[in-house]
A protein has these predicted regions:
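C-terminal motif of bacterial Sec signal peptides marking the signal peptidase cleavage site
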Residues: 38-41
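Short, small/polar residue-rich loop motifs at catalytic or cofactor-binding pockets
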Residues: 333, 474-477, 541-543
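Bacterial signal peptide processing site
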Residues: 43-46
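Bacterial N-terminal signal peptides that target proteins for export
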Residues: 3-31
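Noncatalytic scaffold domains of N-terminal-nucleophile
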Residues: 69-118, 122, 130-294, 299-301, ...
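Active-site rim segments in enzyme catalytic domains, especially the processed small/beta chain
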Residues: 143-150, 154-160, 166-167, 319-322, ...
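Extended C-terminal subregions enriched in glycine
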Residues: 395, 415, 536-539, 577-627
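Internal maturation/activation junctions in enzymes
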Residues: 86-87, 371-495, 624
């Protein structure tokens, strides 16, 4: 594999570097080991952030686990918008924080927050499995990333070892009593944002805890109660509010409306708590002690369930969630959605998650796209700031493939328990004959807006309408990537929906607003929308955990977690096609199209790219595309297998391991 120099933000964008691991040995020999890293050119083997390491090499902890600080991504987060496309607002970016990159020959976890990574590493050191570490980390993320995920939300988890690849669906479900008109007024008009995203109305049945319990029963090693200890300790002792969390608290227009949330996130005089303030959560610690002793049942059928239902029903914007809804919830094992691309096998989540299928479609299109193959290694160039970006032609082809995949997503993707797959099989959307048909739509000029395709023997193309909410931004989310001592891996993504979810707080954690993940408009010109709201249904989800294998083997090559398919697809392309390390690929500018305007990450791309796309007919928008990617990549050093870990420089994530 040939790795290219890692992109660096321009000096005006470079901010504080996350501290590296404990006294570390440097992997200066990576270049000589055949990774071909151009260390001097861009400062490091592990992309932006390797600048604080000698010769840019990754740091490996000399002790059993890395001790990482709580330094967050520098720069204030932007104020969340007061209105939302599709009822949902994008999670704001929070600047750029160079990440040093981490590596380990044994075990490692990369998490969206350093304290969560520490918790996971503690469990790995104690002999825990990848699933054990993911559970411990998620319990801490509920505490340290309350804007992005928690026990009150939903999650997706992929697991792989040398024998099996498994998918676990912990997405929320709609309360039984809701109707498809939940977000419409009496005249059929859409309700405003305050009635859509805040309060009890948008709350679905949380699924994260049941999913974690299901995965632990299958692949846990340590006792369930042991996994709760790091989060309980942190909730009791407190943790300093990160700059990112502080900025999001200060900017949220709805959070202070709930008395419990107001008491937790704001001072007595009403001022939002600031960065560095010690935040203790005794209510959450008590909840965790109850769950550690009793499993998930108290959450779904006991005292916690009663309090959740009461909170939702008695809020100023009441919802329909009941104790019975909670008691009926089931996390589901599913079959991963896998496909081959060149020398890799890419596996993601199946519907109602959309990321696995979108990536399979995009890379299936790349595989048969002559213009993509002709580009060879000429898909990246350096911009004036010294960073890497795609060439206009590469960005054009990537965006058009995404446009086609998202057209099908808007037409077909929904809860498979309620909505049939085209011709009864989701694989029809990646069949060679179907992709060959779709390839004919990609030309020298952008499609602008692509129409959904018609798989063979499918009548659904005329049965369902197009989802007007399909361009809603992806949810706020937290991600994990874990490898344990046995080589088993976990990729996980979890979310509350919007930042801070419904803004309702109960028992020390926030509840989701997952019902905004459905289409608010149930019909399109009289035709039902596949992702319309219905009681007991799971919303379509953009959460995208992904695992890549060396083709034809059980050998894991790459583990990724992301909130949306497009940044994950960019990262996969960076590794599989463009010769980058996972850190370099994550740090590339975010770009692509979800079948709307072609979006480019503002401040990270050149005028040459913008104009090149416009000449190809693209409507280009420069937007502050945040992402929350985490990744693990297997490489070889002196004949030894080594894991490289990295977190998105746009967020405060970190890695820890031994």
């Amino acid at each position: 594999m040939t790795d290219r120099p890692s992109p660096r933000p321009s000096p005006s964008r470079r901010q504080a570097t996350l501290p590296a691991a404990n006294p570390a040995r440097r992997l200066a020999s990576l270049a000589a080991a055949g990774l071909g890293l151009a260390l001097a050119a861009c400062g490091g083997a592990n992309g932006p952030g390797a600048g604080n390491a000698a010769a840019g090499a990754a740091a490996v902890s000399a002790s059993s686990s890395a001790t990482l600080g709580t330094t967050a991504a520098s720069g204030a987060a932007q104020r969340p918008p007061q209105t939302a496309f599709g009822g949902r607002v994008a999670e704001p970016a929070s600047g750029w924080s160079d990440k040093p990159g981490w590596s380990s020959a044994r075990s490692m976890i990369v998490a969206a927050n350093p304290l969560a990574a520490q918790a996971g590493a503690e469990i790995l050191k104690a002999g825990g499995s990848a699933v054990d570490a993911a559970i411990a980390a998620q319990l801490v993320l509920t505490l340290t990333e309350p804007q992005s995920s928690g026990l009150g939300g939903g999650a997706l988890l992929l697991y792989a070892d040398d024998k099996t690849t498994e998918a676990y669906d912990g997405l929320e479900t709609a309360p039984a009593a809701v109707s498809e008109r939940l977000f419409l007024d009496r005249d059929g008009k859409l309700l405003g944002p305050a009635q859509t995203v805040a309060g009890g109305r948008p709350v679905g049945v949380p699924g994260t805890l049941r999913m974690l319990e299901l995965a632990h029963r299958a692949h846990g090693k340590l006792p369930w109660k042991r996994l709760f200890q790091p989060a309980i300790k942190l909730a009791d002792q407190g943790f300093p509010i990160s700059p990112r969390l502080a900025a999001l608290i200060a900017g949220d227009p709805y959070l202070r409306a709930d008395p419990a949330a107001r008491a937790y996130f704001y001072e007595q005089d009403g001022r939002p708590k600031t960065a560095g303030t010690l935040l203790r959560n005794p209510a959450y610690a008590a909840t965790l002690r109850q769950l550690a002793a009793g499993g998930a049942n108290p959450f779904y059928s006991g005292a916690i369930a009663r309090e959740i239902a009461a909170k939702v029903g008695q809020s100023a914007n009441p919802g329909l969630l009941t104790q019975q809804d909670l008691g009926r919830y089931r996390a589901l094992p599913r079959t991963p959605f896998c496909g081959d691309y060149r020398k890799w096998t890419l596996c993601g989540m199946p519907p109602p998650a959309s990321g696995g299928l979108a990536i399979a479609q995009m890379f299936g299109l790349f595989d048969g796209l002559p213009d993509w193959q002709k580009l060879g290694g000429q898909k990246l160039v350096r911009n004036d700031g010294g960073g890497l970006e795609p060439t206009p032609q590469a960005a054009h082809l990537f965006s058009e493939a995404g446009r086609l995949a998202y057209a099908d997503r808007a037409r077909y993707l929904a809860d498979p328990e309620r909505v049939p797959a085209p011709a009864g099989d989701w694989q029809r959307l990646v069949a060679p004959t179907y992709l060959a048909q779709r390839l004919q739509r990609i030309g020298d000029t952008s499609l602008g807006h692509a129409e959904a395709g018609v798989p063979a023997d499918s009548t659904l193309a005329t049965s369902f309408g197009d989802d007007p909410d399909a361009l809603a931004p992806p949810p706020a989310a937290s991600e994990l990537a874990v490898v344990d001592h046995d080589g088993a891996v976990v990729a996980m993504a979890s979310s509350l929906g919007d930042p801070f979810g419904s803004r309702l707080m109960v028992r020390g954690f926030l509840l989701n607003d997952a019902l905004t993940g459905f289409s608010r408009t149930p019909r399109d010109h009289g035709r039902p929308i596949a992702n319309r709201l219905d009681g007991g249904k799971r919303p379509r989800s953009s959460l995208t955990p992904e695992i890549a294998f060396e083709r034809g083997t059980r050998r894991v090559a790459l583990v990724l977690g992301g909130a949306d398919a497009m940044p994950v697809a960019k990262t996969l392309a960076g590794v599989t096609d463009w010769g980058l390390t996972v850190a370099q690929a994550i740090a590339l500018p975010n770009f692509g199209s979800r079948n709307g305007p072609t979006e480019l990450e503002a401040g990270r791309v050149s005028d040459t790219l913008v104009e090149g796309l416009r000449r190809r007919g693209h409507e280009v928008r420069l937007v502050p595309i945040t992402s929350d990617l985490v990744g693990l990549q297997r490489v070889a050093l002196d004949g030894q297998s080594l894991w490289l870990g990295t977190a998105d420089p746009r967020r405060e994530g970190a890695a820890a391991g031994d």
